[in-house]
Regions:
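Conserved HGGG/HGGXW glycine-rich cap/lid loop of the alpha/beta-hydrolase fold
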Residues: 6-64
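Glycine-rich His-Gly loop
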Residues: 28-31, 93, 203
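Active-site loop/oxyanion-hole signature of alpha/beta-hydrolase fold enzymes
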Residues: 41-44, 50-90, 246
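Active-site loop/turn elements of alpha/beta-hydrolase fold enzymes
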Residues: 54-58, 118, 231
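Gly/Ala-rich beta-loop-alpha elbow adjacent to hydrolase catalytic centers
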Residues: 91, 95, 99
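Flexible "cap/lid" loop of the alpha/beta hydrolase fold
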Residues: 100-139
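Conserved serine/cysteine hydrolase catalytic core
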Residues: 165-220, 225-228
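Catalytic histidine-centered segment of alpha/beta-hydrolase-like enzymes
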Residues: 229-242
Length: 255
């Protein structure tokens, strides 16, 4: 009998003040090469909410769970975190794919959602130069993780990270490889099957393909609408947490 995998690291923040959304629960799902703590600024803008965020399998505090075995395991992990409790869901980047797939299969637990620029590499026009279409696949996992991080945060930020942090991030390369591979096998969700209200967010400073994908995804979702933060890029939850929080409140109101 195989040993059970260790549990995912889950962060829970109870409301810190009274407000109109008292009792509202949100679950936050991070993207590739990220972790739950990247939502700290966003959580601070939702003081009257209960917030659950978790390190996805293979990252940060969940590194001991190992790389995901497939995309279905990502959805299963989200359902395990929810534990049969209904929540408004926010998914950033790859986390948006997880949220949409989860909403398609378990709309009773995710009644409404906000997703920010989820990759859609199964679309025929999706650029070959993106990681989700295989760019960097020839690198060793550790090197691909560093390559990915440098593309996301820039060389200067990467080189200023503490040595221990860079070692940890490089070690997450096997997880990155596994989840990017899962996106290369075909669509991980059927937009037509996502019947819940969804706000598809995009940044005014994001890449052309991310902006196009946001528009097309919002149109393909039965109850999808698009929202844009003009001065934001892909990392809007870090650069514009107040605006993302406002969109999450708007998503909750659509439930």
């Amino acid at each position: 009998m195989s040993e059970p995998s260790p549990p995912l690291r889950v962060l829970r923040r109870d409301p810190v003040c009274a407000g109109p959304a008292a009792g509202r629960l949100a679950v936050l799902v991070h993207g590739s090469m990220d972790r739950a703590t990247s939502f700290t600024r966003l959580m601070a803008r939702l003081p009257d909410w209960t917030i659950i965020a978790y390190d996805r399998r293979g990252y940060a505090g969940s590194s001991g769970t190992g790389p995901p075995l497939g995309f279905d395991q990502q959805v299963a992990d989200l359902m395990e975190v929810l534990d049969n409790t209904q929540a408004v869901a926010f998914g950033h980047s790859f986390g948006g794919d997880v949220v949409l797939a989860g909403a398609a299969s378990h709309p009773e637990l995710i009644p409404t959602a906000l997703v920010w620029e989820p990759p859609l590499p199964w679309l025929p026009w999706w650029p070959e130069t993106t990681a989700s279409r295989g760019a960097g696949a020839g690198l060793d996992p550790d090197d691909r993780a560093e390559w990915f991080m440098r593309r996301m945060v820039g060389d200067r930020v990467w080189e200023r990270l503490p040595s221990a942090t860079r070692v940890q991030r490089r070690a997450e390369g096997h997880t990155l490889q596994a989840e990017l591979r899962s996106l290369s096998l075909g669509a991980v969700f059927d937009a037509a099957a996502v019947r819940i209200p969804v706000i598809v967010g995009r940044g005014g400073k994001s890449s052309v393909h991310q902006r196009r994908a946001g528009r097309e995804l919002a149109a393909a979702l039965p109850a999808g609408i698009m929202a844009e933060i003009a001065d934001a890029g892909h990392g809007a939850h870090l650069s514009h947490p107040a605006e993302v929080a406002a969109l999450l409140r708007q998503a909750a109101a659509r439930a």
